[in-house]
Amino acid sequence: MTRVKICGTTTPEDALACAVSGADAIGMLVDVRISPRCITADQARLITSVLPPFVASVIVMQPSTPGEVVDAVRKIRPTAVQLHGSEPPDFLKHIKLQVPGVRLIKTIHVGEGGEIEKARQYEGVADAILLDTASARGGGMGITHDWNVSREIIGSVRLPVILAGGLSPKNVAEAIEAARPYAVDVCSGVEAEKRKKDLRLVREFIEQVRVTK
């Protein structure tokens, strides 16, 4: 069964409502200043504290140093960290040494070229790969990419792969059928306005995922 991550939550109320609606994981953008959905570590800690025990919490970061991630993990205590910048494998190794219990998800930007080679570098270091559409702002723009490329990457790496980039209730079934990911990630595709999830769209998105074979 394809898992669902609802990303860009900004309040405990939204996060809990998404979890109750059936999300497997809740994502929060911590100190990612370029995003309108950016929240502080304190806010993320509060969101994490209200989630049910079997719903994963994922903080999304674009850190300058491994130490920033280590500090955030110790404060927020998330299930996983999604590294959304250009962090090399050694960056992840350093984090694992300091906080070995946290899962690490590395974003690969599709459209830059050499994606398979980049993804393979993180085998044995990352716990999963997330495929987002490349953009001048480093992804997170709500734009789709070629899902056939994603499927090729998924078939070439020995890691669970999460598909992101412009997904919505209208296209997620097609995306799953094309790429066959471990999980799908949605942010703006389930919003009526920025920073606020539309629970009708959240439920519709999750329903589309669950019924897709």
From Swiss-Prot:
Enzyme class: isomerase
Enzyme Commission number, as recorded: 5.3.1.24
Involved pathway(s): Amino-acid biosynthesis; L-tryptophan biosynthesis; L-tryptophan from chorismate: step 3/5
GO terms assigned for molecular function: phosphoribosylanthranilate isomerase activity
Keywords noted in UniProt: Amino-acid biosynthesis, Aromatic amino acid biosynthesis, Isomerase, Tryptophan biosynthesis
GO biological process, one term: L-tryptophan biosynthetic process
One protein family per Pfam: PRAI
Reactions catalysed, as given in the entry: N-(5-phospho-beta-D-ribosyl)anthranilate = 1-(2-carboxyphenylamino)-1-deoxy-D-ribulose 5-phosphate
Nucleotide-binding as UniProt keyword: no
InterPro entries from the UniProt entry: Aldolase_TIM, PRAI_dom, RibuloseP-bd_barrel, TrpF_fam
Family designation: Belongs to the TrpF family.
Name of the protein described by the UniProt record: N-(5'-phosphoribosyl)anthranilate isomerase
Lineage: Archaea, Methanobacteriati, Methanobacteriota, Stenosarchaea group, Methanomicrobia
